[in-house]
Amino acid sequence: MKPAAIVILAIAITVMTTSAEQARPAPKPSILVHLTSGPENPTKAALAFLVARTAIEQGHTVSMFLAGDAVQLLRDSTLDNLAGLGTGKLREHYDIIVKGGGKFYLSGMSSNARGISAAELQGKPAELAPPAILLKLALENERMFTY
């Protein structure tokens, strides 16, 4: 092959590679939603789930860390009955978060104090977690919302 042909081939490969890299969208930031409001504040609780749902719908990876009274939100009776004023129904938000691959972490200490066990979380993408997991998630995720 002649030197000029080699140069042209090298340029063509570079242009094709650069075009393919530019066509690939940048990954969306991962998001952590930290919620401490529970059924006593349905609007704020549903708002946190609405934000997580919206992030899932926009293609973000989402984790939720529920602490304090918020751990009660994953009880089926609460999921089925809680609705915020202008922020929607908790069950609808939860189902979309789950379908989109969202993960829930519940403070183990808060859950224990409110009678929520790992058995009650069976079948849900949720686990009991210590404060060290909250810190780990806060450092790993690119954005964090707190309610």
Q: In which residue ranges do the predicted regions lie?
A:
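Solvent-exposed loop/turn segments at secondary-structure junctions
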Residues: 38-41, 69-73, 104, 110-114
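Short, glycine-rich nucleotide/cofactor-binding loops
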Residues: 26, 33-46, 78
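A glycine-rich helix N-cap at a beta->alpha junction
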Residues: 82-110
